[in-house]
């Protein structure tokens, strides 16, 4: 998916700059959203890593603890080209914990280990805290104005380009699969391609809403989500005025679909809008239905929390903020500046 074709909330930036000139310019700290139990058959291990991807570290931990790889889990994938603090979970029923003081892997440091009663699963995170350094910024004034706009109105909650694979290959392969031009047997590839398909359709609908100034305008039949919650409800015609006030106040979010094998969830005017946006995606929709992927919805807009900016000089900005799990830091940066160097790597979940 070409991110350049997606609508900006605050207009295309005039400033350009570089993100991730080095791994230390992109720091991610996982926020579990709960305190480990301190007891149980699972061991949660928090590791700071630099230059290692998530699965590589998980596999290494499994070998170190003499466990089957399936007994080591994590809540989300993180990029290797960054400094990340991430939790891993070792399933140790009736077993002593390995001596992590002897754990050695280049680029990795064990920060803590604590027992827990439940397995850490994909999506278990509450969110992630980011600290980014943006370098060689060409227009400080424009960036400062955009930071104020983002703090007040947020950014489009787009899936970043990394969701679609390098050069958008996951989406390319998904379309070939949908058209029966290739067979996809490997489970992980099937998952990547289906995820890319659904994410692309979410981005497409969200972009159309922004282009028509509908990102915060409630349509009859819209699916609305309480801020910070995953559940949603449908806007009825006789409630539009009240619901519009709640959206404007930030209590409710307008959502767009991650299509699945069920209905989109909207009705009336909103359903017609979404169906029109997806009119040319029939092959991908058929693939998703055939594979029986469960549908869901996601807020169209994203408001970074606890956003703090610190200018080191006129061309270098340190920016920190918190995002809920599944949201992309690069979607925040996209509204701030154009990147001089394309980088398809980022936090994935």
Swiss-Prot record:
Enzyme class, spelled out: isomerase
Catalytic activity, reaction form: uridine(13) in tRNA = pseudouridine(13) in tRNA
GO molecular function: RNA binding; tRNA pseudouridine(13) synthase activity
Recorded GO CC terms: cytosol
Listed EC numbers: 5.4.99.27
Keywords linked to the UniProt accession: Isomerase, tRNA processing
Highest taxon of the lineage: Bacteria
Binding sites annotated in the UniProt record for substrate: 26, 128, 328
Disulfide bonds: none
Active site positions: 79
TRUD domain location: 154-302
UniProt xrefs under PROSITE patterns: TRUD, UPF0024
Record field: transmembrane: none
UniProt KW tRNA processing keyword: yes
GO biological process, any: tRNA pseudouridine synthesis
UniProt-listed InterPro entries: PsdUridine_synth_cat_dom_sf, PsdUridine_synth_TruD, PsdUridine_synth_TruD_CS, PsdUridine_synth_TruD_insert, TruD_catalytic, TruD_insert_sf, TruD_pseudoU_synthase
CDD domains according to UniProt: PseudoU_synth_EcTruD (cd02575)
Family recorded in the similarity comment: Belongs to the pseudouridine synthase TruD family.
Role of this protein: Responsible for synthesis of pseudouridine from uracil-13 in transfer RNAs.
NCBIfam families, sorted: PRK00984.1-4, tRNA_TruD_broad
PANTHER family reported in the protein's UniProt record: TRNA PSEUDOURIDINE SYNTHASE D
Protein name (database record): tRNA pseudouridine synthase D
Lineage: Bacteria, Pseudomonadati, Pseudomonadota, Gammaproteobacteria, Enterobacterales
